[in-house]
Amino acid sequence: MKICMIGTGYVGLVSGVCFADLGNKVYCVDKDQKKINKLKNSLSPIYEPGLDDLIRNNLRAKRLIFTHDLQKAIKDSQIIFICVGTPTKK
């Protein structure tokens, strides 16, 4: 299955990597190009035990794609998860 995770914070990144490890092709999308570049080099912006190894293995297997191209990721996906912060009223 092809899955799109919009947002590569804690929820989007960990969920996306786990979906990829289950054999799905996962697009992880973020507007922060620096974060995407780090993730493409297997450098996680968050700490979660074992996450770096899962990122590395799934990048190598071509099941995990980090991108800032939201339109392409949505077009190529069957399921889309929106994993961005929810604004609160002040």
PLM segments and residue spans:
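Structural/interface elements that position substrates and couple domains in central-metabolism enzymes
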Residues: 1-90
